[in-house]
Amino acid sequence: MITIRNVSYRIGTRPILDNVSLDIPEGGITALVGPNGAGKSTLFSFMARLRPLESGSIAYRGKNLACTPTAELARTLSILTQENSIMSRITVRDLLMFGRYPYHQGRPSENDKTIVEEALAEFHLQDFSDRYLTELSGGQRQRAMIAMVFCQSTDYVLLDEPLNNLDMYHARSLMQILQKLTREHKRTTVAVLHDINQAAAYADHVVAMKNGKVAMQGKPDDIFTAANIKTLFDMDVSVLDHQSKKLIVHHI
């Protein structure tokens, strides 16, 4: 379980996060949703220890994030941010092997190579595994980055807007892969998602934020109602049942 207690953050006098406390359940996909400026990515940055907490605490299975040694954290938590600074002159296969670095420390084993090859297959990257990142489309590069994160083999995976640069087909395909791997490997995946239909279809748990606070949380079927979406986004929608999932239809 990820335990977040009394986390606040301000820029000047403006609250970005306002005393956020929540428990993210162990296992499955938890989607962080909400309008722009709700505080989702800021909360993500604290959960990923990309910036130091100003107040409150975050713990993974009871272990305080702030006190966890970096080497241990790299084998516990893997992250993908919106902005990634991985060098471009690297092949897809080498990028995925870079995700194994916390284990091989520059000397890849046969097990590391096997994990990389399996990830290339799972994320449909074999056809350009030896191409440089500069030679890939934005969507292909995004899939490669997420595959690298999963190669890290951590119990916790944090993804900030993983569907960036992906068309409808590849966004759905990626969410199906994430759901499959999360379940098979018994991982806990937390993803910031702007597409609430993807969250409704693939998340096991939803945390909805607004104005720096947790507005509501629970199962997708309980969160994605017309009334709740009106509260979150201040817009009218219809919520349909489609193939046992909620489908949110915007009024145009």
Model regions and ranges:
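Conserved ABC transporter NBD signature motif
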Residues: G56-N64, L73
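Conserved ABC ATPase signature
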Residues: Y132-L136, Q140
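Conserved ABC ATPase "signature" region
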Residues: M97, E110-F128, S153, L158
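Conserved structural motif at the start of ABC-family nucleotide-binding domains
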Residues: I2-I4, L17-N19
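Helix-to-loop junction immediately C-terminal to a conserved catalytic motif
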Residues: A48
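The feature captures the beta-strand-to-loop junction immediately N-terminal to the Walker
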Residues: V33-P35
